[in-house]
Amino acid sequence: MAQLPPKIPTMATAWPEFGGGHHHHAAHGHHHQRSPSMGAFLAAPLPPFPLPPPAPANGGAQQQQQQQQHQPSWVDEFLDFSATKRGAHRRSVSDSVAFLDPVSDDNAGVGAHDFDRLDDDQLMSMFSDDLQPPPPQQQPAAPAASASSPSDHNSMNDEKQDKGETDEAQSECDGATPGQPASPATVDPKRVKRILANRQSAQRSRVRKLQYISELERSVTSLQTEVSALSPRVAFLDHQRSLLTLGNSHLKQRIAALAQDKIFKDGGTEEGDREAAANLPPAKPQERGIPTGGRGPGPRPRQCRPDRQRGGRRGRAMPALVIGRDPDAL
């Protein structure tokens, strides 16, 4: 984009009063102090241009002032604008104003007072042609903004600058670490120590939790290995238990059958004993301690029951026999 010379401000300018603008602005108030003037351009270093041969030392300053008064105003404005553009360096559009080269001693007293009274916003309003075009939503209001006074531009630029400073301070506060506070007045050392202690304790607790989790994982792995090793043995023992349970049930059934057979056999034995006892003859009585089945030394005694049934004669003779049998007993 081609650089054009700055626009001439719409104000009543008194060109001979550049050097004495301080009193003029002081008399007219704050509004005239913020209005742009051409003293800012005279304060910038002038580019080299053909000069007349040097004069003696005592009349050099007077001759230079006369030459500046006889030069046309548009020539000074153009030369000052080009010098300002060459000596200025703006990093981005958001920067307030350019970095100007140091002012030479010859031109320091020409417009220094007016240049000191100008702030960055006024200089930015002078170089408004270099700025980027406004966003689409602000294009309809462009004529009204261009017709506004320089004070409106200054207020808008002040708001932008304040916002940028606030964002920068916020970024610095966010970027500052607790261990390295931004300023000792805003950060409490006790609070910093407490925060550091809390972080260290939290880190230690996290380490302990990780160690506990790793130990649990190792124990789970070892238990899974043991389970995989013991699973076949457990399956084999379970099969053996099922076989033993089946054999035990068979044995119980056999024991029950044998018990029933024993009961039947016991019942049959008792019945046979009763039948045998009924078929046997009655038992014979014993005499004087000698069993009925034995035989004594004397003659065989006679049975009394038949003698009683047959008659009384033999019954009566029986005591004689007994008496005759044992004569010594008398």
From Swiss-Prot:
Any one GO MF annotation of this record:
DNA-binding transcription factor activity
Protein purpose: Transcription regulator.
Low complexity: compositionally biased ranges: 57-72, 139-151
Which residues does the UniProt record annotate as the domain bZIP? Answer: 188-244
According to its UniProt entry, this protein's organism is Oryza sativa subsp. japonica (Rice)
Xref: InterPro entries: bZIP, bZIP_RF2, bZIP_sf, bZIP_transcription_regulators
**Signal peptide: which range, if any?**
none
Induction (free text): Down-regulated by dehydration and salt stress.
| Statement: the UniProt record of this protein carries the keyword Lipid biosynthesis | no
Entry comment describing in which tissues the protein is expressed: Expressed in roots, shoots and panicles.
Localization annotation: Nucleus
Residue segments, region Basic motif: 190-209
What is the protein name stated in its UniProt record? Basic leucine zipper 2
Leucine-zipper, as annotated region? 216-244
